[in-house]
C-alpha cells in the first residue's frame, strides 16, 4: 500500500483514513478537503494512478472553493485552489542561483562512454565504479527552492548562473508539492529537475489551439517552455505540465544523502515526483546495457527523451572528481542518435558571421526532423561542401546534430538529378562586395571588409557586444540592431551610447516605453567588469574564459593594451594563435579608437594594478574546505590566486595544500589519507606573509 506522505503522523498512522468532519466545523472540513485533494493530486500527477473519478475530484474541489470564499480566514497558501493562476506579470525577475546549474558533457558513441568510465576510474584510482543512471528529459530545467519545507521560489536554468523567476507559474503545476511531505524539512533545499509536457497532453493542447485558431507547438519541449514562460499564469494553469526531480543545489539543515540514488529515494519520500526509469549499475558495461534497454523502450514512453544520464553514485566520489569548466567530471549525458530525414536542396547561400566567416547554408524543402520543421542546414565551409559533394537539387539526409543544430549529412547518389548544380563559392562578400579571402592553414573563408565596410559583420559584432555575457544590454535584439545598422544610425558599438530617445522611439515596433527601457539598459551596461568588456570587443579566439584570464592576469586595460605577444603568452591557456589575434586586434587604430570612444562614453569597471613581484604559490594547488574564522572562501581564494596559486574543488594526489576550517568534511579526510599538508586560516595567512 502506498504510504500517506501528506500526514505528519507516524508511519503506523499514515495508512489510516482520517475521519471525515461535517460542514458544522468549517475549519476541520476545509483541512480535510485539502488533505483529500492533495492525496488525490499525488496519486494522479505523481503516481499516475487516479484514485477517484474526475467528477468526484471536481465536487470536492468546488466545495473547498466555496468554503474558502465564505470563510476567507481558512485560505492557506498551499491550498489546491491556489494552483489556478494569478494576475499577469509584466516581466520575469532575474534570479541568481546559489549553486550554478551546470550543463553536462555529451557522449554519442559507445567509445565515448567507455572513455568516460576510464577517466572516472583513473580519477578515483578504482575499478567497477557504481553509477546512477536515469533518463535525459527533453524539457526545461528548473530549480525549486524550499525553505522550511515550503516552496518559496522557482527559477529557470537560464545561463546556469542566472535564471528567470517563474514561481507563480510553477505553483500551477499540480505534480509539484507546495509543501514538502515531512514534519522535519531542511532549512533550505534547492531541488533541480525538469518541467515537461507528455506527448498525449501536447496532442490535446494542439487540438484546442487549432479549434481556437491559435499557434500549435511543434514538440513537447517547445510547448513546456512556452507554457512556463507565460506572463499570465492563468494560461499556464490551463496546460498540463509535469515535473521530475533529478538533482540538488543548496542544502542547509539536513544531511546530504550519501549517494545520488539515495537522494532520489529521499525526494520521493518528500512527495517530489521522481522517474521510475532509473537504475544503479557498475562499470561501462552496465551503462551501455541501460542505454540499450532505454533505447528499445523509448518509443513507448509517454514523454520525449533525447538520451540518458550517467552519474557516479557516491556523493563522496563526486566531490573527489570535481568539475571541469562548466560541467561535472562525475557525470555525462549519453545522447541518442539524432533523428534524420530526407529532403531536397533548393539552393545554397552564404552567410557572413561577426568575424567575417563565410558559411554555406543549404536552403531545404521543409521537412520535419525530431519534431521540428527544418528549412535551413549548415554546410560548415567550402571544403566540407566539396568533401560531401552536396549540389543544388540533391536529395540529402538531414540530421539535427545533438537534436539541436540541423546539418546535411550526405546526399543520396541514386536520387541526384541530371541538372544538379555544384556549389561555387563567391569571390566577393554578398553583403559588402569586399574580396573573400582564405588563409592557407584555415578551412574558413572570410570577408575582408571588416566591420567598417561590412554591415553583416557590424550587425553580428553589435549583437555580440550587447549579449548577456558581454555588456548585457537588455532589449537590444536582432530586429532592433538590424534597423539601427540598415538606417545608418549606428556604425560602431560606441554609437550605441550616443543614441537619443527620439531616434529609438521612431524605429519600427518601438514605442516610447520600449525606447525608455533600452536607454535605461544602455546606461546600466556602462558599469561592467574588465572581463566582460574584453569579451564584448569580439576579439577573434577570445571567449569568456580567455577574457577572464586576461583581466585576472593584467588587472587593468592599459596593461593589456601595452602587452606584447610574448607577455600575452604568459597568460594561462593562451597560445601563439590567440596571442597573435589579440595583438593584431589591439594594433588596429580603428579598434583603439573604438575602445577610447567607449571609455569616453562612460563605460567603466573596477581596475586593480597587478604588482610585478614573485608568485610564491606558482605551481601550487590549494583546496578549501569548511568555514574559516575570518575569511570567506572567495576571499581566501583571491589571496591564493594573487600569490600565483590555483584553487581546486576536489582533493587529489596533485593537491599541494588543503586549507581546512570548521565543519570540514570528506575533503579533509581525503587529504589526511593522502598525506597532504593541511593548513588552518592562520597558517595560510602566515604562509602568505612569509612571502610578502
Curated annotation (Swiss-Prot):
Q: Which Gene3D superfamilies match?
A: 5' to 3' exonuclease, C-terminal subdomain, 6.20.10.30, BRCT domain, DNA ligase/mRNA capping enzyme, Helix hairpin bin, Nucleic acid-binding proteins
Q: What is its EC number?
A: 6.5.1.2
HAMAP family assigned: DNA_ligase_A (MF_01588)
Spans of biased composition, class Polar residues? Answer: 1-14
Q: From what superkingdom does this record's organism come?
A: Bacteria
Q: Which Pfam families match?
A: BRCT, DNA_ligase_aden, DNA_ligase_OB, DNA_ligase_ZBD, HHH_2, Nlig-Ia
Residue ranges occupied by any BRCT domain in the UniProt entry: 612-692
**Which family is this sequence assigned to?**
Belongs to the NAD-dependent DNA ligase family. LigA subfamily.
Top-level class of the enzyme under EC nomenclature = ligase
The GO annotation for biological process reads: DNA repair; DNA replication
Question: Any idea which GO molecular function terms this record carries?
Answer: DNA binding; DNA ligase (NAD+) activity; metal ion binding
Cofactor requirement: Mg(2+); Mn(2+)
Q: Which UniProt keywords apply?
A: DNA damage, DNA repair, DNA replication, Ligase, Magnesium, Manganese, Metal-binding, NAD, Zinc
The entry's NAD(+)-binding residues are 54-58, 103-104, 134, 157, 194, 311, 335
Organism from which the protein derives: Janthinobacterium sp. (strain Marseille) (Minibacterium massiliensis)
Q: What is this protein called?
A: DNA ligase
Which InterPro entries does the protein's record reference?
BRCT_dom (IPR001357), BRCT_dom_sf (IPR036420), DisA/LigA_HHH (IPR041663), DNA_ligase (IPR001679), DNA_ligase_AS (IPR018239), DNA_ligase_CS (IPR033136), DNAligase_adenylation (IPR013839), DNAligase_N (IPR013840)
Q: Where is this region: Disordered?
A: 1-27
Amino acid at each position: 500500500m502506498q504510504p500517506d506522505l501528506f500526514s505528519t503522523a507516524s508511519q503506523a498512522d499514515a495508512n489510516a483514513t482520517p475521519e471525515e468532519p461535517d460542514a458544522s466545523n468549517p475549519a476541520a472540513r476545509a483541512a480535510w478537503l485539502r488533505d483529500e485533494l492533495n492525496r488525490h493530486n499525488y496519486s494522479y500527477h505523481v503516481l499516475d494512478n487516479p484514485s477517484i473519478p474526475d467528477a468526484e475530484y471536481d465536487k470536492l474541489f468546488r466545495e473547498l472553493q466555496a468554503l474558502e470564499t465564505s470563510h476567507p480566514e481558512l485560505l492557506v497558501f498551499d491550498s489546491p485552489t491556489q494552483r489556478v493562476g494569478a494576475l499577469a506579470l509584466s516581466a520575469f525577475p532575474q534570479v541568481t542561483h546559489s549553486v550554478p546549474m551546470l550543463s553536462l558533457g555529451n557522449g554519442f558513441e559507445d567509445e565515448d562512454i567507455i572513455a568516460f568510465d576510464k577517466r572516472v576510474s583513473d580519477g578515483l584510482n578504482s575499478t567497477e565504479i557504481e553509477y546512477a543512471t536515469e533518463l535525459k528529459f527533453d524539457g526545461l530545467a528548473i530549480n525549486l527552492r524550499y525553505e522550511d519545507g515550503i516552496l518559496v521560489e522557482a527559477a529557470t536554468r537560464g545561463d546556469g548562473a542566472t535564471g528567470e523567476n517563474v514561481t507563480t507559474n510553477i505553483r500551477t503545476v499540480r505534480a509539484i508539492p507546495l509543501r514538502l511531505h515531512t514534519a522535519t524539512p531542511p532549512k533550505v533545499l534547492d531541488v533541480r529537475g525538469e518541467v515537461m509536457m507528455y506527448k498525449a497532453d501536447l496532442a490535446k493542447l494542439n487540438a484546442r489551439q487549432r479549434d481556437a485558431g491559435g499557434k500549435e507547438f511543434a514538440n513537447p519541449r517547445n510547448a513546456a517552455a512556452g507554457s512556463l514562460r507565460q506572463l499570465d499564469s492563468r494560461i499556464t494553469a490551463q496546460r498540463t505540465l509535469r515535473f521530475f526531480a533529478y538533482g540538488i543545489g543548496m542544502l542547509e539543515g539536513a544531511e546530504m544523502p550519501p549517494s545520488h540514488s539515495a537522494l532520489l529515494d529521499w525526494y520521493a519520500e518528500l512527495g517530489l515526483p521522481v522517474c521510475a526509469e532509473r537504475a544503479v549499475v557498475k562499470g561501462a558495461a552496465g551503462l551501455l546495457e541501460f542505454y540499450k534497454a532505454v533505447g528499445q523502450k523509448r518509443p513507448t514512453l509517454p514523454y520525449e527523451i533525447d538520451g540518458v544520464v550517467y552519474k557516479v553514485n557516491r556523493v563522496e566520489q563526486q566531490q573527489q572528481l570535481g568539475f571541469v569548466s562548466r560541467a561535472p567530471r562525475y557525470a555525462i549525458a549519453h545522447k541518442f542518435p539524432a533523428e534524420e530525414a530526407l529532403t531536397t536542396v533548393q539552393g545554397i547561400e552564404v552567410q557572413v558571421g561577426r568575424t567575417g566567416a563565410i558559411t554555406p547554408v543549404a536552403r531545404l524543402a521543409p521537412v520535419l526532423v525530431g519534431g521540428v520543421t527544418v528549412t535551413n542546414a549548415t554546410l560548415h565551409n567550402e571544403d566540407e561542401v566539396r568533401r560531401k559533394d552536396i549540389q543544388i537539387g540533391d536529395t540529402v539526409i538531414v540530421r539535427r546534430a545533438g537534436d539541436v543544430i540541423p546539418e546535411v549529412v550526405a546526399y543520396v547518389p541514386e536520387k541526384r538529378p541530371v541538372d544538379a548544380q555544384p556549389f561555387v563559392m563567391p569571390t566577393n562578400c554578398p553583403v559588402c562586395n569586399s574580396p573573400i579571402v582564405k588563409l592557407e592553414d584555415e578551412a574558413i573563408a572570410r570577408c575582408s571588409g571588416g566591420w567598417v565596410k561590412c554591415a553583416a559583420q557590424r550587425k553580428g559584432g553589435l549583437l555580440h557586444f550587447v549579449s548577456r555575457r558581454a555588456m548585457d544590454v537588455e532589449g537590444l535584439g536582432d530586429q532592433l540592431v538590424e534597423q539601427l545598422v540598415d538606417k545608418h544610425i549606428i556604425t560602431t558599438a560606441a554609437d550605441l551610447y550616443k543614441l537619443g530617445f527620439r531616434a529609438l522611439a521612431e524605429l519600427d515596433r518601438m514605442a516610447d516605453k520600449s525606447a525608455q527601457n533600452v536607454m535605461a539598459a544602455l546606461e546600466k551596461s556602462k558599469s561592467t567588469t574588465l572581463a566582460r568588456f574584453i569579451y564584448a570587443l569580439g576579439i577573434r579566439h577570445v571567449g569568456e574564459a580567455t577574457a577572464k584570464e586576461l583581466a585576472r592576469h593584467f588587472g587593468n586595460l592599459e596593461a593589456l593594451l601595452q602587452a606584447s605577444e610574448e607577455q600575452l603568452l604568459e597568460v594561462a591557456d593562451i597560445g601563439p594563435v590567440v596571442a597573435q589575434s589579440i595583438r593584431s586586434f589591439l594594433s588596429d587604430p580603428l579598434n583603439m579608437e573604438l575602445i577610447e570612444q567607449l571609455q569616453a562614453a562612460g563605460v567603466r569597471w573596477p581596475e586593480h594594478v597587478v604588482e610585478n613581484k614573485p608568485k610564491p604559490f606558482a605551481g601550487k594547488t590549494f583546496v578549501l574546505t569548511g568555514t574559516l574564522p575570518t575569511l570567506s572562501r572567495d576571499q581566501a581564494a583571491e589571496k591564493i590566486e594573487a600569490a600565483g596559486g590555483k584553487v581546486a574543488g576536489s582533493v587529489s594526489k596533485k593537491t599541494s595544500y588543503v586549507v581546512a576550517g570548521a565543519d570540514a568534511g570528506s575533503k579533509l579526510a581525503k587529504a589526511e589519507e593522502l598525506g597532504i599538508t593541511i593548513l588552518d586560516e592562520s597558517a595560510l595567512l602566515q604562509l602568505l606573509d612569509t612571502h610578502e
